[in-house]
Amino acid sequence: MATQNIRIRLKAFDHRLIDQSAREITETAKRTGAQVKGPIPMPTRKERFTVLVSPHVNKDARDQYEIRTHKRLLDIVDPTDKTVDALMKLDLAAGVDVQLELR
């Protein structure tokens, strides 16, 4: 597995959770002897929603909401078997979406 890389994509609505998860992944990978590139912050996706407040009249009365999706990218170079096992056993926060890709 010396020629393979692991690319990890993290997504979350809370930037503190995603930074904490990225820190845990980098510490775990470095502890097992792998080299880590990142975390690289990717552009934040902002979804905006406009909702009418009144059910009948007053079209000018509206509320606006926003959901921000934060993303981070990590590359683990030259992972060992211990690195893969440690990453699979790692328990991350519930609000973080993790995607692993072997390259």
UniProtKB/Swiss-Prot annotation:
Coiled coil: none annotated. Disulfide bonds: none annotated. SMART domains: Ribosomal_S10 (SM01403). Pfam families: Ribosomal_S10. GO terms for molecular function: structural constituent of ribosome; tRNA binding. Keywords: Ribonucleoprotein, Ribosomal protein. GO terms for biological process: translation. One of its GO terms (cellular component) is ribonucleoprotein complex. The keyword Lipoprotein does not apply. It comes from the Bacteria. InterPro entries: Ribosomal_uS10, Ribosomal_uS10_CS, Ribosomal_uS10_dom, Ribosomal_uS10_dom_sf. Belongs to the universal ribosomal protein uS10 family. Part of the 30S ribosomal subunit. Involved in the binding of tRNA to the ribosomes. This is Small ribosomal subunit protein uS10. It comes from Hydrogenovibrio crunogenus (strain DSM 25203 / XCL-2).
